[in-house]
């Protein structure tokens, strides 16, 4: 049996401001830093250790990984950054306030954009200053790999090749991994690991900064999963996350 740990980044400034974030590179709040440090302490107290950390190329996840490792006294561990662990791209909603969008388009439409499996928000124009297509960190990617919008289905489609090509082989070889990423890239992994249907994944929320531990068998199938710090605390945090703009 081996373990895999998934952690959503700590609270970001745009989580706090209820703005859709997506691929926009925003900071952690002081609360987010504290959540990341507490995640590290919880892992250390549970006796869970790692060989390698995987994270996205967005600093709210990178800094969460660093603060978590600091809390574990494991700052020397390698941290591998991969764009495929980025948050779902929110297209034309990025940077906008969820409540304002609900007033403009209606609660039902905004909920469809946020929570449906296969309906993306309106795309950005390629020349929109919010587009990441000129961002140097994505310079080696083909233009069509840098999205202008995504639904969760699209996020799953980019996360699963990373799982099959890199993460799963590393785990099968005995590597102990922690993945520090985002609400929707983690939902993509959870959907795959637990074989959750397209309909049921809509109701799954991932709390900020609380380690989700999977026990995996030799075939990398889950035998159990649990949140450190208790299920009640995780459920309460997830309910708060569900009310915030995604990202």
UniProtKB/Swiss-Prot annotation:
Keywords: Gluconeogenesis, Glycolysis, Isomerase. The active site is at 9 (tele-phosphohistidine intermediate), 87 (proton donor/acceptor). It catalyses: (2R)-2-phosphoglycerate = (2R)-3-phosphoglycerate. GO terms for molecular function: phosphoglycerate mutase activity. GO terms for biological process: gluconeogenesis; glycolytic process. It is an enzyme of class 5 (isomerase). InterPro entries: His_Pase_superF_clade-1, His_PPase_superfam, PG/BPGM_mutase_AS, Phosphogly_mut1. Its EC number is 5.4.2.11. It comes from the Bacteria. The record marks 182 as: Transition state stabilizer. PROSITE patterns: PG_MUTASE (PS00175). Pathway: Carbohydrate degradation; glycolysis; pyruvate from D-glyceraldehyde 3-phosphate: step 3/5. CDD domains: HP_PGM_like (cd07067). Substrate binds at residues 8-15, 21-22, 60, 87-90, 98, 114-115, 183-184. Pfam families: His_Phos_1. Homodimer. Belongs to the phosphoglycerate mutase family. BPG-dependent PGAM subfamily. HAMAP family: PGAM_GpmA. Catalyzes the interconversion of 2-phosphoglycerate and 3-phosphoglycerate. This is 2,3-bisphosphoglycerate-dependent phosphoglycerate mutase. The lineage of its organism: Bacteria, Pseudomonadati, Pseudomonadota, Betaproteobacteria, Burkholderiales.
């Amino acid at each position: 049996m081996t373990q895999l740990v998934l952690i959503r980044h700590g609270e970001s400034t745009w989580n706090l401001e209820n703005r859709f974030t997506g691929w926009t590179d925003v900071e952690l709040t002081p609360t987010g830093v504290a959540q990341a440090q507490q995640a590290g302490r919880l892992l250390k107290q549970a006796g869970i250790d790692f060989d390698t950390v995987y994270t996205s190329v967005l600093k709210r996840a990178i800094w969460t990984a660093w603060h978590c490792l600091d809390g574990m006294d494991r700052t020397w561990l390698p941290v591998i950054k991969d764009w495929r662990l980025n948050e779902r791209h929110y297209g034309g909603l990025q940077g906008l306030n969820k409540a304002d969008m609900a007033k403009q388009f209606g609660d039902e439409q905004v909920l469809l954009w946020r929570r449906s499996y296969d309906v993306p928000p309106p795309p950005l124009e390629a020349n929109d200053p919010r587009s990441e297509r000129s961002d140097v960190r994505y310079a080696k990617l083909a233009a069509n790999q840098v999205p202008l919008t995504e639904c969760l289905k699209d996020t799953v489609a980019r996360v699963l090749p990373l799982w099959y090509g890199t993460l799963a082989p590393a785990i099968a070889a005995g590597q102990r991994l922690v993945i520090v990423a985002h609400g929707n890239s983690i939902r993509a992994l959870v959907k795959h690991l637990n074989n959750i249907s397209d309909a049921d994944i809509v109701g799954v929320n991932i709390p900020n900064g609380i380690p989700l531990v999977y026990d995996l068998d030799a075939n990398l199938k889950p035998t159990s999963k649990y949140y450190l710090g208790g299920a009640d605390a995780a459920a309460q945090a997830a309910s708060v996350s569900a009310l915030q703009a995604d990202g």
